[in-house]
Amino acid sequence: GDPPRFCRDKLCSGDGDCSVWCTAGCNHDMGKCDTL
């Protein structure tokens, strides 16, 4: 639902920028948070 979609839309420079819902942390290739 909402958390994974939110993760993929959130820009990040490191895993610390991503919420606990973003189980894959920061996807550096895309510069966005991601889920597993």
Curated annotation (Swiss-Prot):
Keyword Glycosyltransferase: no
Keywords (A to Z) from UniProt: Disulfide bond, Hydroxylation, Secreted, Toxin
GO terms under cellular component: extracellular region
Keyword Disulfide bond belongs to the record: yes
Sequence positions bearing 4-hydroxyproline: P3, P4
GO MF terms, alphabetically ordered: toxin activity
Compartments it resides in: Secreted
Tissue-specificity statement: Expressed by the venom duct.
Cystine pairs: C7-C22, C12-C26, C18-C33
Family in the record: Belongs to the Pg turripeptide superfamily.
Domain-level remarks: The cysteine framework is IX (C-C-C-C-C-C).
Name of the protein in question: Turripeptide gsp9b
Biological source species: Gemmula speciosa
